Amino acid sequence: LSGRVGDYNIGVIDAVVGANGDLDSQNAFVGRVTREILDQSTVGALVTHGDPNSDYDNLLLGTDFQYLTNKFLNNYRLEVNAFAVATESDHPDFQDGLAPVFGGSVVLPADEFDIEVGLMHVDDNFNPAMGFAPRTGVRRYYTRWAYKPLIESKDWLRQVYYSYEGEYITDLSNQLQSSKHLITPLHLLFESGDQILLEIENSADVPGNDFRIYNAAGDENDVFIPVGDYSWTRGIFGFQTSSRRKLQFQHDYSFGDFYDGTRTEDTSELTYLPSKHFGAEISYSNQDVELPAGDFNIKLASLTALINFTPDFTWSNVVQYDNVSDSLGVNSRLIWEYRPGARIFLVLNQSYLEERTGFVRKQMDTTLKLSSIFRF
């Protein structure tokens, strides 16, 4: 249930999760409230309760604030974000009371430049059972600076971009875990809408334990990155045609070092938009990695097709294959907006596993969802 009451935006999901194996049936709850304050700013709160993957209790509480103004230094738009979240669980691995996450960011976008800085602190015991935390026990510092002047002296060139993006992640003792520096010395936007870019990326990683970086289905030769202090540099070249074209193409090629080896990656996307009723996209990426611990290749291909029968009735399809899991996934979704604000979703998901005789279906599920807006 979601909606607006006065100055408040409210969203609630309450679900009963059925018993599965050793897990009993339980209730899962998510609630979110925001309120507009000042001219364009908001303050909000978030609560989740339940753990669909265990019988342990889990509670998450959070609050956030976003400040927006278009009058910073009289001419600029300024965005300031701040948030704080904490979890509490009776799981034996997370019983040290509230485990907090907090952070904030400042964004200053303008016609000729962009500036963004942010930081985040994640406690060791942070455990959002209704979400996920890619890394815990870390502090993350981030910044991005871009200069993007319009070019009026060249008829064929519209804009040039120069940028720097940096990320620095430490543990809670401020010891480096990983870092990334991405420099864009050349990014040209032509009057045709086509673009080319060149980027240089320097990365560092200090893993405290050996970790598996590659494991293919049926492959006993896992590839591990040993404990160490790694630093490497890569180059990235890309171009893409204008989004105004019926037939669009994008290609990115990256090359260089990777941990104590090398990695190259080719990614291509071809998009066809002949009319407002149909669109299709084919994408393919090929990644070759050579490491002292072993070499491997990763291929990923996908096909997306969207059919708009009418403005109110659409059919979208996604097919994806990768050679690591040797699996093919299919997602098909029908959406019918039978009246303004009221929709019916019919979703079909299938997964196939590649075997010697061809693809064999391993899983299929169908979901029917109703969504409606009520005004009162």
Predicted regions and their residues:
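Structural motif corresponding to the C-terminal cap of alpha-helices
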Residues: 41, 67-69
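Exposed, low-structure sequence patches enriched in small/polar residues
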Residues: 71, 75-78, 83-376
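Residue-level detection of beta-strand scaffold positions
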Residues: 32-34, 46, 64, 83, ...
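Gly/Pro-rich turn-and-neighbor structural signature
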Residues: 53, 61-64
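A conserved hydrophobic secondary-structure block that centers on an alpha-helix together
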Residues: 2-56
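A residue-level signal for conserved active-site and pocket-lining positions in enzyme catalytic cores
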Residues: 1, 33, 65, 145, ...
